[in-house]
Amino acid sequence: MASSTTNNPALDLDSDTPENPGHELAQFASGCFWGSELRFQRVVGVIKTEVGYSQGHVHDPNYRLVCSGTTNHSEVVRVQFDPQVCPYSDLLSVFWSRHDPTTLNRQGGDVGTQYRSGIYYYNEEQDCLAKKSKEAKQKEFKDKRVVTEILPAKRFYRAEEYHQQYLEKGGGNGNKQSAQKGCNDPIKCYG
């Protein structure tokens, strides 16, 4: 991570780079990051996923602090992908399919600003595609407003290790779920 360009590193843009120069990064917030991460893990062309916190104002947050509602961070999945195999538009389709983008600061029983809907982009092309996809999604909802925010990706703070690939590792009850590419098994989210 480069040095801070503001007085608060949490407000800086995410300057991390993919491990391979031909790959890209993307950040998505769609409620609890466990189920979202597993869905992205299954996408052909996704090289790596990490869950963490972004878009907040507190440097080096942790899960307990984010859940307190005082940091303004979102729970996000950061995806490293090969755009030659998996176009960004495919990731947007996965994002929209994983949650209700019309509920503000909640997904199901999970309530709080950390569960808001957001697309956090790394370049102008991602910004443009995200906005077009939101416009298309809004047409599907006649009487509801899509509340998904689309903003530049701020610094990514990797969540605690036990959150990484949580459902693939068995979650809270030891029932491992497949992260195999192309898997369409239902995703069961449990703590």
UniProtKB/Swiss-Prot annotation:
Gene Ontology BP annotations: cellular response to oxidative stress
Taxonomic lineage of the native organism: Eukaryota, Viridiplantae, Streptophyta, Embryophyta, Tracheophyta
UniProt-recorded name of the protein: Peptide methionine sulfoxide reductase
GO molecular function, one term: peptide-methionine (S)-S-oxide reductase activity
InterPro entries on file: Met_Sox_Rdtase_MsrA_dom, Met_Sox_Rdtase_MsrA_sf, MsrA_MetSO_reductase
UniProt cross-references to HAMAP family, sorted A to Z: MsrA
Function statement: Has an important function as a repair enzyme for proteins that have been inactivated by oxidation. Catalyzes the reversible oxidation-reduction of methionine sulfoxide in proteins to methionine.
Keyword Kinase: no
Known EC number: 1.8.4.11
Keywords, ordered alphabetically: Oxidoreductase
Enzyme class: oxidoreductase
GO CC terms in record: cytoplasm
Chemical reaction(s) catalysed: L-methionyl-[protein] + [thioredoxin]-disulfide + H2O = L-methionyl-(S)-S-oxide-[protein] + [thioredoxin]-dithiol; [thioredoxin]-disulfide + L-methionine + H2O = L-methionine (S)-S-oxide + [thioredoxin]-dithiol
Region feature (Disordered): 1-20, 168-191
Organism superkingdom: Eukaryota
The family this protein is said to belong to: Belongs to the MsrA Met sulfoxide reductase family.
Organism of this sequence: Fragaria ananassa (Strawberry)
Pfam family, one: PMSR
